[in-house]
Amino acid sequence: DFVFAQTWPDAVENLKLLDEYGCKPEIELFDLGDIKLLNQMIKNDKIRGPYWVQMITGGTGVAPVIESIQYAEHMLPENSLLSILGVGSGQTPLAAAALVMGHHVRTGMEDNVYYAKGKLAESNAQLVERIVRMANDIGRPLATPAQAREMMGLGAPRAYTFDGRTYGGEVHTLDEMVSDNS
């Protein structure tokens, strides 16, 4: 058993470092009361918009119901981009609701190892493909990496080095990086 504790000064320092390095923080809402903390950080000029907000549903804090999304819509500050993450059995229904409501979705085996009741997911790709299929079925366009960066107020990718090779200006997949360096 352990508790992950982050004090207000810790959070402020982390936000300062993220901003200094041109990174957009993901504000995770484990409880709807966390919106109050986000608003306090904005009021004290500790974070700049647009605000990338990830609402974790299905855990111990946020119920995996549409009303949770509606509450967040009402309470989040302007210039917020809301993404929904469903843990457990709420993942697929909440992802569908988020897409229909015009929000974003996070999926993957970090959050849910099941594809369906009693059926383990084969891969992250399988979970992502389901979200893509759902979005296509309702006519919801998917953002390209460049569009996502623009929505979040991020500039072009900076150059970085991985395993002795420098990348920059273009977005590379992890598969490309690994195959290029093997």
Predicted regions span which residues?
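Structured C-terminal cap/extension of enzyme domains
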Residues: K36, E67-P77, P93-S182
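Catalytic alpha/beta core domains of metabolic enzymes, predominantly
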Residues: D1-E110, L120-Q126
